[in-house]
Design a protein with these regions (language model features):
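N-terminal ligand-binding lobe of clamshell/alpha-beta domains
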Residues: 1-156
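Alpha/propeptide regions of enzymes that mature by internal proteolysis
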Residues: 133-516
Length: 516
């Protein structure tokens, strides 16, 4: 309905970028082109059917896409081709209208296809979607459900569903019985606050928000919710309120609630290890509600306690930095925010880690982050080794090189064998323990890798069932840290040497590489 208001003369030419060594795109009969049409775009018609087809430079220039989109892996194709004559000369490349979406949405039809089409349409027509005259639905709250918070000063808690920009937004709203002081990492110390909350904007709204600016969007959201910016303090997130975690920690008469939303897929980062490039509303948002009255300094110190607990949860899950996943765990997302309410009742002056109130805050936040990350991103401690490798940017398919082999072994033989090996708990645990050692080595906590190299030799020989006089380099990427390279290469060498026909045919260099 929303894209139907866009005149045919303003419909944009859109192409899905695919390929690696060549530029490719879905064929004319692909469901991906149907998604482009559903989003109001015009896909290319190349006269070629199939899931993936080659598009020539001449066809590319003739179509002259106004918007290009792909999944994360397609960035390499863009990097390789979009600086070359012809490929770089189309409108989308010249104007920087290139978007990337999660592969799970772009590359397969699913129950979430409708969500992706909405997000794509919003990316294509941000200017049109910003205009109120193009809206289809009235902006208002149309549904809410209660949240029970057993605190004397809380009048009501709920999650309100509202229509904003024609997309469903969700807001955690906590109304107080009387005005109260809060401290917010987004707004600072504020008094006279009657409402705190956490607002979720769905992906189709993100581009619109960036276009309007956070200030204008805040005013719009407050207006729809019937709240005043003077008496309400909200956080903003892209994590769904349906995945909200509500945690309570208690000791005798002392209680603390932590209400947490968390998403760590897109911009998890390590403080001091990653470069900050932009600002956007928080991705891990925490609201802390004590049942006692915190002094101003106790409220401030609670921010540190909550942050420490959040970071502990991320590190216990081994959440990786989105920017340097091979090297660093994440300490946060770089866009996180916390609200601490003063509370009422017995006066509390200290909330550090050695105090009981600090302990309760930490426990509630830790549990909240763990649950919220699971609900939003599906991350748990016991996730499989393939997922953990993927989080570091390592895939089995992209790992193997057979350039050092004289035999007829194919990379598919090694990748298949590696997949089978990693399904065995013994070898999966070997890789998992190597991940921890790799992090310690990168931080300088482990400097001598001799023992690990010896362990890798033993693992390779156990898999092979025979002695191995020399290791050959079977790991393709050259940016994998030394510990992980040794570990994965050991598994591949063991698999490679299982067959007698391969033994002795390797021409690779001796494993004389030195590791600091």
């Amino acid at each position: 309905m929303k894209v139907a208001k866009i005149p045919a003369s303003k419909k944009k030419r859109v192409i899905r970028l695919m390929g690696r060594d060549r530029v490719m795109t879905p064929g004319d009969d692909s469901f991906q082109n149907h998604m482009i049409k559903a989003a109001g775009g015009i896909p290319p018609e190349l006269g070629k059917d199939g899931n993936v087809v080659v598009i020539t430079k001449e066809e590319w220039m003739k179509f002259n896409p106004q918007v290009i989109y792909g999944c994360g892996g397609d960035r390499e194709t863009a990097k390789r081709f979009f600086s070359r004559p012809g490929w770089k000369d189309v409108e989308a490349v010249r104007e920087g209208r290139i978007f990337y979406f999660p592969c799970d949405l772009t590359c397969r039809a699913s129950t979430r296809t409708g969500d992706f089409v909405s997000a794509l349409a919003s990316a294509l027509y941000q200017d049109e979607f910003v205009l109120k005259e193009n809206q289809v639905h009235e902006e208002k709250v149309f549904r809410s459900r209660g949240i029970k918070l057993d605190l004397d000063y809380v009048k009501e808690g709920c999650i309100a569903c509202s229509m904003i920009h024609d997309f469903e937004n969700k807001t955690l709203i906590i109304d107080f019985k009387e005005p109260m002081a809060v401290i917010s990492t987004l707004e600072g110390f504020r008094e006279g606050i009657e409402t705190v909350g956490n607002h979720y904007s769905p992906p189709p709204c993100w581009g619109i928000t960036h276009r309007l600016g956070l200030g204008a969007e805040r005013r719009r959201i407050y207006g729809v919710l019937g709240k005043s910016e003077k008496s309400a303090s909200l956080l903003f997130t892209g994590a769904d309120m349906d995945n909200l975690s509500v945690q309570k920690a208690r000791f005798r008469d002392m209680e603390v609630y932590a209400l947490v939303t968390a998403g760590v897929r897109s911009n998890a980062m390590r403080a001091s290890g990653d470069e900050g490039k932009f600002y956007e509303p928080g991705t891990i948002n925490i609201i802390i509600l004590p049942n006692m009255k915190l002094t101003r300094r106790a409220m401030t110190r609670a921010l540190i306690t909550a942050t420490e607990a959040k970071t502990a949860a991320l590190q216990d899950l081994d959440v990786r930095s989105s920017y340097t996943p091979l090297l660093n765990q994440a300490t946060g997302t770089g866009t996180d925010n916390v609200i601490v309410a003063r509370g009422t009742g017995t006066r509390i002056q200290y909330t550090g880690g050695h105090t009981k109130m600090g302990e309760l805050i930490a426990r509630a936040v830790y549990a909240g982050v763990m649950e919220a990350v699971f609900r939003q991103n599906g991350l748990i401690r016991s996730r499989n080794i393939f997922q953990r490798l993927k989080e570091r940017g390592i895939t089995v398919a992209g790992l193997v090189s057979v350039d050092q082999c004289e035999c007829s072994v194919e990379s598919e033989d090694l990748t298949g064998g590696l997949e089978e090996i990693l399904l065995q708990p013994e070898y999966a645990s070997f890789v998992a323990s190597s991940m921890s050692m790799s992090d310690d080595h990168e931080r300088g906590l482990v400097t001598d890798l001799g023992a690990h190299e010896h362990l890798c030799q033993m693992v390779a020989e156990k898999i092979a069932g025979k002695d191995i006089d020399r290791m050959i380099d079977l790991v393709e990427p050259d940016d994998i840290p030394p510990v992980m390279e040794m570990t994965l290469n050991a598994l591949l060498n063991g698999i490679y040497r299982v067959s007698d026909k391969n033994f002795g045919k390797a021409r690779g260099r001796n494993r004389s590489k030195s590791y600091p």
